[in-house]
């Protein structure tokens, strides 16, 4: 049996360090309430004033204001995850999700020849649950990783979420440290003993052999919406409804879109496309870093291969929400165009996927891991929660088909003499 196969088989036999690691995500904490009507009106008034001053704004500018406005932005002051928030993510449902991603990282670290240092970088870490689960796996494989210098780097713009992450990962609050000579605004030591730093921008994360984890990160980046007309591509903008002065509406821009000229291909068959320049900048950065220093990026998100058109939508209290209604009180998202990502990466690195979440987790051995956890627990409530989390992660009408996994690896990684990348090939047990 190969070292990789032994690692993956061993992973399925891991026993949780404590009972509180056993899929009790819904009970972990309650999220805060939504902004009240006064807060929502404040952001709407800000947007209306901006439009009156400078004219209609792009969907990209609207998303940036609604999600990350320093005063009233949706992400800036809210814990929106979990049963009582606006959406639930895979790590909040089941510890197995994060454990398997941790095994994936170790598998790729071994395939790379066990480098002496490893940076775990998560983009948009949410409540810190996924990183926490990953680090627990690293600790469980402490003997294997003993000679590796591991550090954690979190890219987070939300003060509220960074506070929650710090509490979860280190067990205590960490004050913001503003140093003009350093891009790090928080730092500490995790409960598992690894140094952790927080950054506002991916560009500030140190170079080195790194695993970049982006779970439901790219779908929240601002998009431009473009419409094909007889006169060329026009950008869809957001303006004030002339009939209802406190309401916003979509309008078609009057001029040829510069964004379209840059990012839309001449043979684009769709009449409506969504383009994310921010995603292009980030994925290109990751590809260059990975090919130069080693490591990989693992991206999990809603997505497609360039066939979908209008995917811009809002979520509030687990239900679809009008994207232009009460800005700042709902999450805004758009599906990731993985074909666009592949095109941007180009020859800088190699891409794998997308494959469905069901396929990826199946290939990583989720069924075996579930069986082990069920056998190890005599608590009926824990067993039910394990099965409930598994079903949501895997079922086609839940997350199993909707979420996709996509990876960027060094060009050298796909040489035929190397073992296949875990998760993107069928699991073979010997």
Swiss-Prot record:
MF terms in GO: protein-arginine omega-N symmetric methyltransferase activity
Principal place of residence: mitochondrion
Enzyme class: transferase
Keyword list, A-Z: Methyltransferase, Mitochondrion, Transferase, Transit peptide
Superkingdom of origin: Eukaryota
Catalytic reaction annotation: L-arginyl-[protein] + 2 S-adenosyl-L-methionine = N(omega),N(omega)'-dimethyl-L-arginyl-[protein] + 2 S-adenosyl-L-homocysteine + 2 H(+)
Disulfide bridge positions per record: none
Localisation per UniProt entry: Mitochondrion
SUPFAM superfamilies: S-adenosyl-L-methionine-dependent methyltransferases
GO cellular component: mitochondrion
Keyword Secreted attributed: no
EC annotation from Swiss-Prot or TrEMBL: 2.1.1.320
Single biological process term from Gene Ontology: peptidyl-arginine methylation, to symmetrical-dimethyl arginine
Transit peptide start-stop: 1-31
Family of the protein in this entry: Belongs to the NDUFAF7 family.
Protein purpose: Arginine methyltransferase involved in the assembly or stability of mitochondrial NADH:ubiquinone oxidoreductase complex (complex I). Acts by mediating symmetric dimethylation of 'Arg-118' of ndufs2 after it assembles into the complex I, stabilizing the early intermediate complex.
Protein name per the record: Protein arginine methyltransferase NDUFAF7, mitochondrial
Organism for this UniProt entry: Xenopus tropicalis (Western clawed frog)
Lineage start: Eukaryota, Metazoa, Chordata, Craniata, Vertebrata
